[in-house]
Amino acid sequence: IHRRDNHLSVGFLGISHLLPALTKCGQNELAFALLEQKGNPGWLYSVINGATTIWERWNSYIAETGTFGDVSMNSFNHYAYGSIGQWLYRTVLGIQTGENTDESGYHKIFLTPSWGGALSFAKGEQETPFGKITSSWEKKENSIVYHCTIPANTTAHLSLPASDHNSVQILEGAAIADTAVSGVADFELVSGSYTFKIC
């Protein structure tokens, strides 16, 4: 990745695994660098060239020259590289469901938001059978403010990137501090709205 100046070099089959693998291996900043790559190939390259959907080719249209890619393979609404959406939801917003039967279907919610790169904020929601989950964070001058809502009849386990619980201030909600291990502060949440400040 570094030899290619933080450009992608995988195809349709590898793209869905790349950012999650980097995150899992502790290379989240590198994953953010790939997300924020403005050159070709890269997700923002398409956006800079006018994309509002995921294109089949990174260079389906080049705004500066007004040219289109090979018309035999040039869909402007093609999921192939769309796995970035899953990474944004599961990693940047941190919205996940449990894998055990009693946790599935968002009965038990796992929130593991992650910030990095040049992103200054992230905000999203997930509709579930129990109601809407929201997750958002914003970088402030010397802190990060994280907000979430947990729907009725569910519980959530929140893991915030923080050195310990002392670096996390609860601004809204009655979160119960759980553990703090290796740069992560954990909390147990019931339905309601919560706001945290991480210093």
What kind of feature is each model-predicted range?
Residues 18-19:
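Conserved small-residue packing positions in alpha-helical repeats and bundles
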Residues 29-199:
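Non-catalytic C-terminal accessory modules of carbohydrate-active enzymes
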Residues 1-15, 67-78:
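Solvent-exposed loop and edge beta-strand segments that line ligand/cofactor-binding
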